[in-house]
Amino acid sequence: MEHYLSLLVRSIFIENMALSFFLGMCTFLAVSKKVKTSFGLGVAVIVVLTIAIPVNNLVYNLLLKDGAIVDGVDLTFLNFITFIGVIAALVQILEMILDRFFPPLYNALGIFLPLITVNCAIFGGVSFMVQRDYNFVESIVYGFGSGVGWMLAIVALAGIREKMKYSDVPPGLRGLGITFITVGLMALGFMSFSGVQL
């Protein structure tokens, strides 16, 4: 149990997808203007990561890994295309559910919801799962923790950006300029967790 708790804390704070690895920056910067929208996208990313990483773990271990189907048959060259296909299917299902049951959130996310398919945070989480050879339960914990960490970062950035709307920002830094500086300072804050050993 302690191992899983350590993995969860590491994936949220120490190895934060957005602020340690800088993955998923396109949607991270574009959707972080309002806390409500950021929270909705963060929940969507949590759901996709929590499902995509374990499902891809099963696909990798049962089909693609060297010797998984037949001894001597290595299908790992199909990793990327298979993982992207699984992620795309999950995002499509999530998009249909949001459209049906949560139309305001679906409309607020707009084009960024289908972009979760190619969000490098999702694919990065799946790639880290394979690289670190997580088992099925570890991949569930890692997927959930990575999603929570990404959501924590985007909601924090959205809160800061909402407050900065009323600040006296120098004209040359307005818009994305001050946002990049803010993200850099947030990343420095999360870097302080890097020395923590669990």
From Swiss-Prot:
Topology class, membrane: Multi-pass membrane protein
One of the protein's GO biological processes: sodium ion transport
Cystine crosslinks: none
Record's keyword terms, sorted: Cell inner membrane, Cell membrane, Ion transport, Membrane, NAD, Sodium, Sodium transport, Translocase, Transmembrane, Transmembrane helix, Transport, Ubiquinone
Recorded superkingdom: Bacteria
Protein localization: Cell inner membrane
Protein's name in the database: Na(+)-translocating NADH-quinone reductase subunit E
Function: NQR complex catalyzes the reduction of ubiquinone-1 to ubiquinol by two successive reactions, coupled with the transport of Na(+) ions from the cytoplasm to the periplasm. NqrA to NqrE are probably involved in the second step, the conversion of ubisemiquinone to ubiquinol.
Species assigned in the record: Photobacterium profundum (strain SS9)
Subunit description: Composed of six subunits; NqrA, NqrB, NqrC, NqrD, NqrE and NqrF.
Similarity annotation: Belongs to the NqrDE/RnfAE family.
Pfam families in the cross-refs: Rnf-Nqr
InterPro entries linked to this entry: NqrDE/RnfAE, NqrDE/RnfAE_oxidrdctase, NqrE
Principal location listed in the UniProt entry: membrane
The keyword Phosphoprotein is assigned to this record: no
Catalytically driven reaction(s): a ubiquinone + n Na(+)(in) + NADH + H(+) = a ubiquinol + n Na(+)(out) + NAD(+)
Its EC number(s): 7.2.1.1
